[in-house]
Amino acid sequence: MSLAETLLWLCKIPSPIGEERELCDRVSERLSRVNLAGPIRRYGESIVVPLTRGHGGPHVALAGHLDVVRTVHDGPARIEGDRLYAAGAADMKSGLALMLDLAENPERPALDLTLVFYAREEGPFAENELGPVLDQDPELRHVSVAVALEPSDNKLQLGCGGSLHATARFRGRTAHSARPW
C-alpha cells in the first residue's frame, strides 16, 4: 500500500476525540501482521509498538495521536488530484501513515525504534493518554529521543506544554486552535 493509500485508509476510519477505539483496533490488527521486535502493548485506547531492537544505537520513539478534531463540514475522505481531503488528514493521520509505512517497509532503520499511537490529544490535558502510557510502559522510560509527528509548518519545532480551561462559544467552521486559518 502506498503512503497516500495508507493515509486514505486511516482517514476513512473516524476517530474524533473520545472515539479512538476502532482506529486503535484497526491499527493494532494491521501491525499484528508485521514482523515486530516484540508484542504490541495496549494501554486504554493507545498502543506501544516495538519495531526494531538490537542495533546498539539510540532508542528512538515516534509518537502520534489517534484522535482528530470533530468536524461536520469536510465530507468523506477523498483524493482530488494530488490532494487528500479528510478530517485529521494533516493533524495527525499523516504522521500515523508515516509510522505505519515505516513498520510495513522491509527496509528498517538501523536503530532501536518504538512507535507510540496514543488517544485523546485534542482535548483536555487530564484526558490525554500519552502521560499514562509513558508512566506505565517501562521501555519508554529509557528512550534516547522521542519525536511527536505533529505537523508544525514542515519544520522541526520544540514542543510546548500547558493548558487553559475555559468555556467559549464560537460560530463558523471547525478549525484547529494552533492553526485557525
Predicted features along the sequence, with ranges:
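Acidic-enriched catalytic cores of C-N bond-cleaving enzymes acting on peptides and small amides
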Residues: 178-181
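A non-catalytic alpha/beta surface segment that caps or lines the substrate-entry region
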Residues: 6-9, 15-57, 77-78
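Active-site metal-coordination/substrate-binding segment of hydrolases
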Residues: 58-117, 125, 139
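N-terminal hydrophobic or amphipathic helices/low-complexity stretches enriched
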Residues: 1-13, 160-162
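Buried hydrophobic positions in well-ordered alpha/beta secondary-structure cores of metabolic enzymes
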Residues: 14, 31, 62-65, 99, ...
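Acidic/histidine-rich catalytic neighborhood of metal-dependent amide-processing enzymes
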Residues: 97-165
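Short beta-strand-to-loop capping motifs
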Residues: 51, 170-172
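Short glycine-rich anion-binding loops that position phosphate/pyrophosphate groups of nucleotides
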Residues: 65-69, 152, 173
